[in-house]
Amino acid sequence: MFKRIFLLTLTNIAVIFLLTLFISLLHLDRWLNAYGIDYQTLFLFSMVVGFTGSFISLAISKWMAKMAYNIHVIQEPSNEAERWLVETVAELAKRANIRMPEVGIYESPEVNAFATGPSRSNALVAVSTGILSQMNKKQIAGVLAHEITHINNGDMVTMTLLQGVVNTFVVFLSRIIGFFVDRLFSRNEERESIGIGFYLGMFISEIVLGLLASIIVAWYSRMREFRADAGGAHLAGKEAMISALKKLKQIMEGESAFIDERSPALNAFKINGRPGGILALLATHPPLDERIKALERIPD
């Protein structure tokens, strides 16, 4: 976790340097200063706003998941199915060389599972009753291995940091655009104060930039799913992972296809997401056919 935070901090420093250089080369700093805009302070403000919400969400992610899905965390297995589930997660965590995550079950007809938590050593793997009833043990093991890989790769932290970075730029650029629009349409005597043009420009640009930011985050999420599939194949076996995805494909193409939307923020961390369709650029998961083909290309 700390390695990723360090790397993202370096990335932010590099971005700040390049942004400052870009503004200076285009002499935008003169224009910004002329209108009383301290862009360096604005950028720091944007970072605070951009990252605060992301880190709070990460810190309480396990609690949120438990509340949203009413997850039954298995402290002591009460039946054979729970015992097998806990033992399988423990074995996969051992193979991945990470601390045993909490294991839980949530009541839902969706065939899905997800991992969440603020770090590799403080995570939760939850499975639906739907997946337990519709998949065999080999397939479930593949799904669990996929989720363990998400934890091992630190995907929850990385996604949070990436979201914080794009949030920062959305906040920063939308306010710069707002200032520009306000000065463009205001009369000279009105330029000493912020007018309606600022708020209108900021609001519209936040929507547009937010959409572009979502496309970037979704693209990274799709790449992350391919890595989690490959890691799942390494931990549980390629055939188990392929079998699990083929079963998911069969279910999603049937009449019983269902995605539980009680906590949309967790959808990106599930084994399966809603198909992208026209909005494929915003899909957090690649098409199942592509994921299966990627696994089939892995050497035995």
From Swiss-Prot:
Record-listed E.C. numbers: 3.4.24.-
Source superkingdom: Bacteria
Active site per UniProt: E147
Short name of any one Pfam family annotated for the protein: Peptidase_M48
Positions annotated to bind Zn(2+): H146, H150, E225
Places the protein is found: Cell inner membrane
Protein name (database record): Protease HtpX homolog
Species the sequence originates in: Methylacidiphilum infernorum (isolate V4)
Lineage: Bacteria, Pseudomonadati, Verrucomicrobiota, Methylacidiphilae, Methylacidiphilales
